[in-house]
Amino acid sequence: MKKILFFVLCTLSLGSLSAQSLLTPEQLAKRERHKNLTVKEWNTDSKAKTRWMDRLKVYDSQGRCVEEIEYATYGQKWRVVSKYDDITGKVTEEIEYNDRNRPVRIKKYEWNADGTKAKQYNYLPNGKLYSVKVYEYIFSDK
């Protein structure tokens, strides 16, 4: 039992180290600055001088954006909640909500071994797949 637990812990720690090695120093520095951060963007009407929140971004303890909300003068326009893979640190799912906080779109992602996006699956709120986006990367020597 102890051997299995040790193996699992080693695998998880190596996975997190390999995920960190995929990130550039700039990306790591950006994530470090965003740990447990909430960013609020405010707008002010030039005539009435009324102020309202335009956008809200919430970052988790690892500096990843887990929620983003867009507002208008009347309230929430939309909201996106992101879920990440614990090992790779890449986005695995995004759920978009409307102004009534009801899901309107679900996106699930697959990633290539080199860290580039491979596929994006788009689902309706009822879970039915309605489209797939495939990413193709073409490098040319010019």
Identify the residue ranges that each predicted region occupies.
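Bacterial Sec-dependent N-terminal signal peptides
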Residues: 1-23
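Buried hydrophobic residues that stabilize the cores of well-folded domains
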Residues: 20-142
